[in-house]
Amino acid sequence: MAKRDYYDVLGISKSASQDEIKKAYRSLAKKYHPDVSKEKDAETKFKEVQEAYDVLNDSNKKAQYDRFGHAGTGQDPFGGAGGGFGGFGGFDDIISQFFGGGQTRRTRQTSNVGEDLNMRMTIDFMEAVLGTTKNVSVDITQDCGHCHGSGAESSKDVHTCSKCHGQGFINVDQRTMFGTMRSQQVCPQCQGEGQTIDNKCHVCSGAGRVKAKKTVDVKVPAGVDNEMTLRVPGYGNGGRKGAESGDLYITFRVKPHKIFKRRGSDIILDVPITFTQAALGDKIDIPTIYGEVELTIPAGIQSGTELKLKNKGTKDPRTGKTGDQHVIVNIETPKNLSSEEKKLFEQLSKLDSPRKKSGWDKFKSFFTN
């Protein structure tokens, strides 16, 4: 099967800028990452997106592709990606792919932005429907305070890489059916940094990064529900060499309530009433998420009838619209009657006999006519 055009894979035009290419890749990589997507062919699509990005994000490879198509990139026009993608890690791994792993110095520089982090938070039902504030502690990585991310013990220990001369990449010539073609690869000596280090920082052991904790008061909006995700800007991993931090994404799990249930932004409550209340009607106090309110039970109500309390639901966090509370009436049949109660029901049954007979006749008519 012929390979798809890389521009079509990313959904961009041939005149797309580097920022537009990166934005399209990031969106599609999030959508099709196997750890996130439930689509059956997510892994195949993810590899296809990764392959397209690897070519279009490299100026030399992009130029060859624009001239010669898939053959110009060293890829089989009818096969899979030449190098493959290997295994898949967690979601943090794909976030790092959004900014890292490029083949040029310009691409390497964009990797300075901190990675996004993801966490799950369990909250109570009432916290979810009314909103709350949670103090969150996040484990992050950030630039070492001693070496400021360089990985060197001092500035004197940093030297321009002798292999790539500070470019972070080297040129590699390959023979193809169209002749010798030149591509760029990350410098193996400096790993794309453009510099080498004599003495490593004693604090971070040359990594340039250290572990740390961040705390933040997260305002949970009223109306959040299971699997909803909240973005907290700037509380992901710290950026490299002064770049901005990534973001924190919190996905919620809401504990069930003893009496309340949810249907979107509406609250559902089952309320038991007696035969007497159902027949004669009544006024009863009903709990809502905002406190008790008085509810009128109309005379003659049937079991399963749903009564509405306007604007007594939770808010929709996206629109701000408030839902309603739906009260479902359940008529309880009395058990273990006293002798006096039995006599009263027998008297009621005698008074109700003509109506009961009429109803039974109507019921039988459905089968006899």
From Swiss-Prot:
Q: Where are the CXXCXGXG motif repeats?
A: 144-151, 161-168, 187-194, 201-208
Q: Keywords in alphabetical order, please.
A: Chaperone, Cytoplasm, DNA replication, Metal-binding, Repeat, Stress response, Zinc, Zinc-finger
At which positions is Zn(2+) 1 bound? C144, C147, C201, C204
Give the Pfam families listed for this entry.
DnaJ (PF00226), DnaJ_C (PF01556), DnaJ_CXXCXGXG (PF00684)
Q: What is its main location?
A: cytoplasm
Cofactor binding note: Binds 2 Zn(2+) ions per monomer.
Localization annotation? Cytoplasm
Q: Which residues bind Zn(2+) 2?
A: C161, C164, C187, C190
Gene Ontology cellular-component terms listed: cytoplasm
Zinc-finger as UniProt keyword: yes
Alphabetical GO biological process terms = chaperone cofactor-dependent protein refolding; DNA replication; protein refolding; response to heat
**Zinc finger (CR-type) residue numbers:** 131-213
A single GO molecular-function term is: unfolded protein binding
Which PANTHER family did the record assign? CHAPERONE PROTEIN DNAJ, DNAJ HOMOLOG 1, MITOCHONDRIAL-RELATED
Subunit-structure text: Homodimer.
Domain remark from Swiss-Prot or TrEMBL: The J domain is necessary and sufficient to stimulate DnaK ATPase activity. Zinc center 1 plays an important role in the autonomous, DnaK-independent chaperone activity of DnaJ. Zinc center 2 is essential for interaction with DnaK and for DnaJ activity.
Q: So what does this one do?
A: Participates actively in the response to hyperosmotic and heat shock by preventing the aggregation of stress-denatured proteins and by disaggregating proteins, also in an autonomous, DnaK-independent fashion. Unfolded proteins bind initially to DnaJ; upon interaction with the DnaJ-bound protein, DnaK hydrolyzes its bound ATP, resulting in the formation of a stable complex. GrpE releases ADP from DnaK; ATP binding to DnaK triggers the release of the substrate protein, thus completing the reaction cycle.
The protein depicted here goes by the name: Chaperone protein DnaJ
Q: What is the lineage of its organism?
A: Bacteria, Bacillati, Mycoplasmatota, Mollicutes, Acholeplasmatales
